[in-house]
Structure formats: structure tokens, C-alpha cells
Amino acid sequence: MNALLSQKLLGYDNDYQLPTVIWQDNSAAQTWTDLETFGGQTESQFPLGQDQAQIQNHYDEETFEKYCKSYPTFHQDLISDKANQVTLDFELDQDIHLNGRAILQLQVKSSVSKGLLSAQLFDFGPAKRLSPIPGMVSRNSLDNGRYYAQENLTELPFTETPYRLITKGFINLQNRTDLLTVEAVTPNHWMTLRWELQPTINKLKKGDKLRLVLYTTDFECTVRDNSEWQISLDLSQSQLILPH
């Protein structure tokens, strides 16, 4: 860091080259590596199924109020397959170093002239993973922290967890091409989406299980709509695409 700051702020020619991508390896504790590029050139495709599926948007009033007051409760029901959702599980038949934006290619229709879709992709099943919240390694071991005080040294714990979020995304069907293009949603008319989820880098190995959850309202991140409509999915014309 000192070499980089000296080069950028002081104009010191020290020939330091910052790697294109610096990535914390999710398969081991305190392991950092550099990558030549962000975004894989190879794609693995996972068909979503053979049938059609429906997602109801409306919840009964008690459940809706519960989710509004506590979105972590909603997320827990989501991973447990208890919310209004479509849940799809996959087992990997090869090692995949996910690099870039996972893509959902979907055939969908809405029962009304609007529509919202949310998606979350999980590394699912008990395994050792990096936790999302840092834990303390050593108390007051860092000098000159906030307000020049000593701070705790923290690190993401590498511990067994039941699942780990890989990526997620949200799409308004009226902006299905891009955010600046408004398109009509014709009720009960099939639409084809190519939907890029949030970018990520994640190392997955053969035999790992992925869980894809598709739903409408996300009580943390989207408008909390409880009106009565549904989204239909033609799973036989839909797939998950992972770049690596």
C-alpha cells in the first residue's frame, strides 16, 4: 500500500504494478491472490427444468406485516423454501471458478401489466466458508485507527455454515432490456429475459450444491408490494449461465 500511495500521490517512479484483480479466496482462510482478468471467457449452462412454475406475489396480512418488520425473517424463510418462491437445486459435475456476472435466461409472463423478479444464488449445504461479518482476531493491536485510537484486528472467519450467498439481483419487467428503456408488460404474454446478476468471484468444486431462489418482492431491497398478481416461468426454456 505504501508503494502504491508513493507512486500515485507523490509521483515516485517505483515501477509498482497493481494487479488487475485482487481476490480473497473463498475456499481458505486469509488467502489472497491476483487474477489477470475479471469476467470469464467460458460459460457453463444449467437448464432450470422441464415444467412451468408460478410465483405468487401476495401474502396474507399477518405474514406480510411480519416480513415488513423483520426482513431477516423473510430471508430465513426464503432459504428454507417457506416464502412465495420457486426453488431450484443443482449439483456441480465439475470445478467452476465463477468469475463475472451469473446470467439468468428466463421465459416469463406476468398476470398483470407490471412485474418484479428477484433472484438469489446460494452455495448450499454444510461446508467451511468465509463468514460475511468480520470477527476479532486480536484486541487493540492496530495503531492509528479511527481518531488515532487503537483498533481490533479483524478477519472474516473461515467456519462451517449451512449456506452462503453467492450473488443476487432484482429486475423490473418494464425495464427488462436496460434501466433507461421502458417497455410495456402485456398480461399473460411470454417474454424472454437475459438478466445479469451482481458481479462476483467464487470458487466452487465438483459436488457442490447450488440453490437458486426466484421470487417477487424482496423485503430488504425492493418496493414492498402486496397486491395480487403472479409470475409464470417456463423452466424448459430457461437456464442459469455461470461464466468462468
Language-model region placement:
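C-terminal, loop-rich substrate-recognition/catalytic regions characterized by aromatic stacking residues
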Residues: 1-244
